[in-house]
Amino acid sequence: MSEMSLIMLAAGNSTRFNTKVKKQFLRLGNDPLWLYATKNLSSFYPFKKIVVTSSNITYMKKFTKNYEFIEGGDTRAESLKKALELIDSEFVMVSDVARVLVSKNLFDRLIENLDKADCITPALKVADTTLFDNEALQREKIKLIQTPQISKTKLLKKALDQNLEFTDDSTAIAAMGGKIWFVEGEENARKLTFKEDLKKLDLPTPSFEIFTGNGFDVHEFGENRPLLLAGVQIHPTMGLKAHSDGDVLAHSLTDAILGAAGLGDIGELYPDTDMKFKNANSMELLKQAYDKVREIGFELINIDICVMAQSPKLKDFKQAMQSNIAHTLDLDEFRINVKATTTEKLGFIGRKEGMAVLSSVNLKYFDWTRL
């Protein structure tokens, strides 16, 4: 059995997919798509090493200790070149994680022809009439190239060292005069590029798990600036001490959302040692944090918030706070509840030295079946 490693390309921006979630993080059952696709291929062969390119290494490492991860580049070729630095096996298989349902039959066809050329690649024939600039092309000469592809590692590295932009391995190797061998591709190996493609693939649907997160934050009164809660001005001068604008509710809610998704906390994302967050709009930071959560495949179910303050009274502001949260997070207002309570004059809150907020949220996997 030939020594071979596997590279899975999962660092793309999913621009053409055109949803809030990056396609590599769509959930298939409980697995993100990148993991589902990698598990599928790794079940067919005892790869020497499996390398996954990523734009979110810390989060992806939570799913497995069996793979190596490397930060992707700005292009496919750059990502592949970086991943190849970790590969020393004679052969390397490269695939896009967006080709989720590669079959064992296709995999075996690639392996069986390993000694035929420098790069073995699956390809589909074109059945439909094909036009270019309104001129009919000879469809018999057209091939739709797919992945996974198997290449001789040294030759692929050399091909990419040309620093030219190639969209797949076979064209890079062919540009150097290398020999390409085509095997029959398959419809199931078509790339998931547009959200409409989901309807063409028989994929497991997301599981119905719910993820709960809590966030707690405290700030001291003392700044002669507006007191903001959920971006709503509560008092013109009773501001809270903070590196940002001091919106303690926004901070608590941000932590709750990050926690439910497993993305750390607000201090990691927006450190108070970074001057670019000085006096920052905390509701805008909340929105950015939720955008990151949505990118990795989650969406909010509901929010419940308890504001603890002896003063000022908040009854007349709760509706405005709920509305502003709904607008910021693109969430139905009926899914948001803001409560206010005192501590009956006990403790630092009762002494009017500061205020605290406890936020709880529930997340679920993004339901891509609605697309």
Curated annotation (Swiss-Prot):
InterPro entries in the record: IspD, IspD/F, IspD/TarI, ISPD_synthase_CS, MECDP_synthase, MECDP_synthase_CS, MECDP_synthase_sf, Nucleotide-diphossugar_trans
Catalytic activity: 2-C-methyl-D-erythritol 4-phosphate + CTP + H(+) = 4-CDP-2-C-methyl-D-erythritol + diphosphate; 4-CDP-2-C-methyl-D-erythritol 2-phosphate = 2-C-methyl-D-erythritol 2,4-cyclic diphosphate + CMP
GO BP terms in the entry: isopentenyl diphosphate biosynthetic process, methylerythritol 4-phosphate pathway; terpenoid biosynthetic process
Catalytic activity, EC: 2.7.7.60, 4.6.1.12
Name of the protein described by the UniProt record: Bifunctional enzyme IspD/IspF
Site entry (Transition state stabilizer), positions: R16, K23, H243, T342
Stored SUPFAM superfamilies: IpsF-like, Nucleotide-diphospho-sugar transferases
Recorded coiled-coil stretches: none
Residues bound to a divalent metal cation: D217, H219, H251
Region (2-C-methyl-D-erythritol 2,4-cyclodiphosphate synthase): 211-371
Annotated segments matching region 2-C-methyl-D-erythritol 4-phosphate cytidylyltransferase: 1-210
Pathway: Isoprenoid biosynthesis; isopentenyl diphosphate biosynthesis via DXP pathway; isopentenyl diphosphate from 1-deoxy-D-xylulose 5-phosphate: step 2/6; Isoprenoid biosynthesis; isopentenyl diphosphate biosynthesis via DXP pathway; isopentenyl diphosphate from 1-deoxy-D-xylulose 5-phosphate: step 4/6
Function: Bifunctional enzyme that catalyzes the formation of 4-diphosphocytidyl-2-C-methyl-D-erythritol from CTP and 2-C-methyl-D-erythritol 4-phosphate (MEP) (IspD), and catalyzes the conversion of 4-diphosphocytidyl-2-C-methyl-D-erythritol 2-phosphate (CDP-ME2P) to 2-C-methyl-D-erythritol 2,4-cyclodiphosphate (ME-CPP) with a corresponding release of cytidine 5-monophosphate (CMP) (IspF).
Co-factor requirement: a divalent metal cation
Single GO MF descriptor: 2-C-methyl-D-erythritol 2,4-cyclodiphosphate synthase activity
Binding locations of 4-CDP-2-C-methyl-D-erythritol 2-phosphate: 217-219, 243-244, 265-267, 270-274, 309-315, 341-344, 348, 351
Species: Campylobacter jejuni subsp. jejuni serotype O:2 (strain ATCC 700819 / NCTC 11168)
